[in-house]
Structures are given as structure tokens and as C-alpha cells.
């Protein structure tokens, strides 16, 4: 059997990444050019700055990924690219580069949903067992997804307002923490106690929707009022209390989803899946079903996860033509108009 190599491109936000996947789940390279330092002074991602950085480094990422993998363009079987959701300018840079590379090398083009990439990052660790439930938690998304078979995604619950990662960054900014704040809040939370009361929105309601705007507002109001009155707040306890509220919500909704759908596995993925507090709670409270969380290096945005998702689409011969365009608000159940089913 001839080995299959997929080159994947990811540029949906502030990471430029190119990866090479061998066959189903062996990552030969996963080059990531991070822009975090460029965005820190702004306290968040500036879309125009992100796009310019992508343009500056993407060619080098292609070269480095191929060199690290020890293959050439002639060895490749396909090119995969994130076409949404994400920042439209950032997406267009990766999309243009991937399309040009695929066209120049006569390779099929595989369109990949960014969130499907996060979910399928777990495939690098072990084969996924279907049907499964996925909890996807990142800076832009908080979703519960039912996956009856590979590549078939059904959103069964999502946030009505802020994503969980967005809430972390916003309260981190209020506390004067460095962007992105999730890791620092997690570390501080482990040193503190859950002493401040924060709301757990919709935690007892029967549906599978999330809401974090009320929690974020309650945190900001507490911090603001204490500052106005000259009251001292204990940073570690603030972080522990905020994180306890977040994790209570995530665990409650995930347990409800598992009780309603015939899942054989739970996948937890996305940037917030790197949170040690979340990992600890999952290990303690969900023991009746196997829980798979990608390795830390695959939790954030990276092209390796896009390649792992693309392998599923390659098996189905789901290719796109060169009219493929960026879809910044792409949903799980959307497919490109330019799909060519062979």
C-alpha cells in the first residue's frame, strides 16, 4: 500500500500553521508561527495585524513543514485548508496559499471546518469510537456536538453569548493578567479557594445551551465595586471562584448530553481543553465512559488537527474546486458550495 501524505494549512486566527500527515494519524510535522507576542499589547487579536503576520510567514511555514517531514511536494496526495469559521482576512491568506500550492502541484483540495479540526485532533492519540459526544471549548466557540459517524457533526448545544475562552480573556484583562489569560487563571486557581459567589447560568435547565455573559458581568462588577470601595480582593481566590463556576457549567451540560445520546466516547477539545482544572474535573466526575483529550500541543490552533480532520474527508473523496471561499461564520452542518464528490 502506498503511503498517503496530506499537507494542511491553518490560519483562522492568530496562528499560522502548516502540517504534514502520513496516512491516518501520523503527524510528520506541525509547524506553528505564533503571533501572541504581537497581540499582547492590544489585549486581544487585532484582525488586520493577524492577516499581515500570516502573509509574512506562511511561505516559510510551507517550506519548514515539508523539510521537517522529509518529503517533497511530489510525494503529497492532497492539500487541506481551514476555510472557516474564523477571521475573514486571516482565513483568506491561508486559503489563497493552499489553493495556489494545490493548483501548482496538481493536487486535490480538501476544505476543513476549523472546529472539526479541533475535534479530530483526538485521532492522533487513539482511534475514535462512534457514536461520540464532543465538548468543544475555545476562544470563539463553546459547543456540544454529537458525532454518530466520522465526518457527521450535529450541534446539540452551544453558547448563547460569550465563548468560554472569551470569558477567560475578558476577566483576565480586568485583573491585569497577560493575554491570553486562560493558562494564568488556571494556575492561579489551583492556589486559591472558591470563596466568591458567581452565578452558574442555566445550569439546572433542561436544555444543553451555555451562557457565560452573566458570569463575566458578575465578575467585572465584583472587581469594579471592590476597587471603588478600596476593598482588597484575593487574586488566587478570584480565579478559583471564576474557574469553579465555569467548570460547573461545562460539566453539568456535558453530563446531560451523555445521558441523552448513545455515546461510546467523550472527546474534549479546543484551546480551553488545555486547562488542567477541566482535565482534573473530567477525570473525577466522568468515569463511566472513555474521555479523550488531545495532547497539549494539539489543543490550540494548529494545522496538525486540520490534517487529521482532512483524512476523514479524503477517505470520502470530499474535494473542493478552486472557487472555494472563506466562510468566517461557518457552522458544523454547512458544506462548501464548491464540493466535488468524486
Curated annotation (Swiss-Prot):
Any Pfam family matching the protein: TsaD
Cofactor: Fe(2+)
Cofactor: binding details: Binds 1 Fe(2+) ion per subunit.
Database matches in SUPFAM superfamilies: Actin-like ATPase domain
GO CC terms, sorted: cytoplasm
Positions contributing to substrate binding: 136-140, 169, 182, 186, 275
Family matches, as InterPro entries: ATPase_NBD, Gcp-like_dom, KAE1/TsaD, TsaD
Single biological process term from Gene Ontology: tRNA threonylcarbamoyladenosine modification
Primary localization: cytoplasm
Catalyses which reaction(s): L-threonylcarbamoyladenylate + adenosine(37) in tRNA = N(6)-L-threonylcarbamoyladenosine(37) in tRNA + AMP + H(+)
Sample GO molecular function, one term: N(6)-L-threonylcarbamoyladenine synthase activity
Alphabetically ordered keywords of this record: Acyltransferase, Cytoplasm, Iron, Metal-binding, Transferase, tRNA processing
The enzyme's E.C. designation: 2.3.1.234
Subcellular location: Cytoplasm
Enzyme class: transferase
Binding site for Fe cation: 114, 118, 301
Family classification: Belongs to the KAE1 / TsaD family.
Function: Required for the formation of a threonylcarbamoyl group on adenosine at position 37 (t(6)A37) in tRNAs that read codons beginning with adenine. Is involved in the transfer of the threonylcarbamoyl moiety of threonylcarbamoyl-AMP (TC-AMP) to the N6 group of A37, together with TsaE and TsaB. TsaD likely plays a direct catalytic role in this reaction.
Descriptive protein name: tRNA N6-adenosine threonylcarbamoyltransferase
Organism of provenance: Streptococcus pyogenes serotype M4 (strain MGAS10750)
Gene name for this UniProt entry: tsaD
Amino acid at each position: 500500500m502506498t503511503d498517503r501524505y496530506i499537507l494542511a494549512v491553518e490560519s483562522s486566527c492568530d496562528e499560522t500553521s502548516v502540517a504534514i500527515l502520513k496516512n491516518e494519524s501520523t503527524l510528520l510535522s506541525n509547524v506553528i508561527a505564533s503571533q501572541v507576542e504581537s497581540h499582547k499589547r492590544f489585549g486581544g487579536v487585532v484582525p488586520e495585524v493577524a492577516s499581515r503576520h500570516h502573509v509574512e510567514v506562511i511561505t516559510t511555514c510551507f517550506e519548514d513543514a515539508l523539510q521537517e517531514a522529509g518529503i517533497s511536494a511530489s510525494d503529497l496526495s492532497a492539500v487541506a485548508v481551514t476555510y472557516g469559521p474564523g477571521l475573514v482576512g486571516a482565513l483568506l491568506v491561508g486559503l489563497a496559499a493552499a489553493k495556489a500550492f494545490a493548483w501548482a502541484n496538481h493536487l486535490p483540495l480538501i476544505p476543513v471546518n476549523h472546529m472539526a479540526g479541533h475535534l479530530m485532533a483526538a485521532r492522533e492519540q487513539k482511534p475514535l469510537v462512534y457514536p461520540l459526544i464532543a465538548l468543544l471549548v475555545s476562544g470563539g466557540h463553546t459547543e456540544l456536538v454529537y458525532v454518530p459517524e466520522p465526518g457527521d457533526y450535529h450541534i446539540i448545544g452551544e453558547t448563547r453569548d460569550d465563548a468560554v475562552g472569551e470569558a477567560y480573556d475578558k476577566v483576565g484583562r480586568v485583573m491585569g493578567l497577560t493575554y491570553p489569560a486562560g493558562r494564568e487563571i488556571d494556575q492561579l486557581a489551583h492556589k486559591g479557594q472558591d470563596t466568591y459567589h458567581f452565578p452558574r447560568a442555566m445550569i439546572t435547565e433542561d436544555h444543553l445551551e451555555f451562557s457565560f455573559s452573566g458570569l463575566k458581568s458578575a465578575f467585572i462588577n465584583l472587581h469594579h465595586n471592590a476597587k471603588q470601595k478600596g476593598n482588597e480582593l484575593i487574586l488566587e481566590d478570584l480565579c478559583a471562584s471564576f474557574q469553579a463556576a465555569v467548570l460547573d457549567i461545562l460539566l453539568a451540560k456535558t453530563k446531560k448530553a451523555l445521558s441523552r445520546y448513545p455515546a461510546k466516547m467523550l472527546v474534549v477539545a479546543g484551546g480551553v481543553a488545555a486547562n488542567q482544572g477541566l482535565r482534573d474535573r473530567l477525570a473525577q466526575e466522568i468515569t463511566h465512559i472513555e474521555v479523550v483529550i488531545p495532547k497539549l500541543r494539539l489543543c490550540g490552533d494548529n494545522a496538525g488537527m486540520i490534517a487529521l480532520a482532512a483524512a476523514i474527508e479524503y477517505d470520502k473523496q470530499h474535494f473542493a474546486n478552486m472557487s472555494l471561499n472563506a466562510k468566517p461564520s461557518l457552522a458544523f452542518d454547512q458544506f462548501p458550495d464548491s464540493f466535488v464528490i468524486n
